[in-house]
Design a protein with these regions (language model features):
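Conserved alpha-helical positions within TPR/SEL1-like repeat arrays
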Residues: 60-71, 83, 94-105, 116-117, ...
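N-terminal secretory signal peptides that target proteins for export/translocation
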Residues: 1-12
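Terminal, low-structured helical/coil segments at or just beyond the last alpha-helical repeat
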Residues: 38-51, 246-280
Length: 280
């Protein structure tokens, strides 16, 4: 996609990467935003597996099996274990919540939402589940209901940096750039080491044409996480927008090398397209 931000011989690249955090950082999943060709990179995490105790119920045992499988990246096996847990105890909110994460992991967003609904019916004060349901709704293009969920997550936990970040993403998708900036800034106030929020605020500054502010935010994101390939790609995009093709190429090549090493073929190919566009 071409951002209409430049004049004369300056260059701008085709893709920026926006990060939405669910609950942790154990994996990455790509989904496309409805209103643009940007790429939403979602970091998917599961809770650390609990240790079995002599008092653990059968439902609890299957729940812990599910956590162990999910932590290993075996989402389908995790779903099977969570389902067994639920069949033994239909009031077990953590199993619905965790199965929702696993469904999201395999691309079943509707199934994820259904499970989050059940988890919230059983535990209506769980801020994390509201955040997770918001992410599932946002991935389906339902930004307004996603924002409603993020609002509730923030009401229940007013220092929930990830919920502010995710609400910022939804607002940015709706075109509310000022609202997005406010949310990203609040996320950073809560957690000054939050590289994801720096990256996303940088994207919003870049979209508005404030390339130097964008570069400053990308610098912070990369300082906090030197192997943060999306931020390297995005800083390269901003450098290209200022006419600094040399710095842009360096960042894009670093991003491509990291993504190639990680085996993230889709994002690697997009960065390579950015490099190709830069040479035009």
């Amino acid at each position: 996609m071409k951002w209409q931000l430049l004049t004369q011989k300056r260059h701008v690249l085709g893709k920026i990467f926006t990060i939405a955090v669910l609950t942790g950082c154990t994996g990455m999943l790509c989904v496309s935003c409805n209103r643009s060709q940007d790429v939403l990179v979602t970091e998917i995490g599961v809770s650390r597996p609990n240790r079995l105790t002599p008092k653990t119920s059968k439902a609890g045992e299957f729940y812990i099996q599910g956590q162990n499988q999910h932590a290993k990246g075996n989402s389908k096996l995790a779903i099977a274990a969570y389902s067994k847990s639920i069949s033994l105890n239909s009031q077990y909110a953590p199993a619905f919540k965790s199965r929702g994460l696993a469904y999201f992991d395999v691309g079943n967003k509707e199934g994820a939402i259904a499970d989050y609904n059940q988890a919230l019916r059983l535990n209506p004060n769980d801020a994390e589940t509201y955040n997770n349901r918001g992410n599932a709704r946002a991935s389906l293009g339902d930004q307004q209901n996603a924002i409603t969920d993020y609002n509730e997550a923030i009401r229940l936990a007013n220092n929930y940096a990830e919920a502010y970040n995710n609400r910022g993403n939804a607002r940015a998708t709706q075109g509310d750039k000022d609202g997005a900036l406010a949310d990203y800034t609040q996320a950073i106030r809560i957690d000054q080491t939050y590289s994801v929020a720096y990256n996303n605020r940088g994207n919003t500054y870049a979209y508005q044409g404030y390339q130097q502010k964008a570069i400053a935010d990308y610098n912070q994101a990369i300082r906090l996480n030197p192997n943060f390939a999306p931020a390297l790609n995005n800083r390269g995009n901003a450098f290209a927008a200022t006419g600094d093709k040399r710095s842009a190429l360096q960042d894009l090549q670093r991003a491509a090398a990291i993504l190639d090493k990680e085996g993230n073929k889709e994002l690697y190919q997009q960065v390579m397209k950015n490099i190709e566009e830069l040479g035009r």
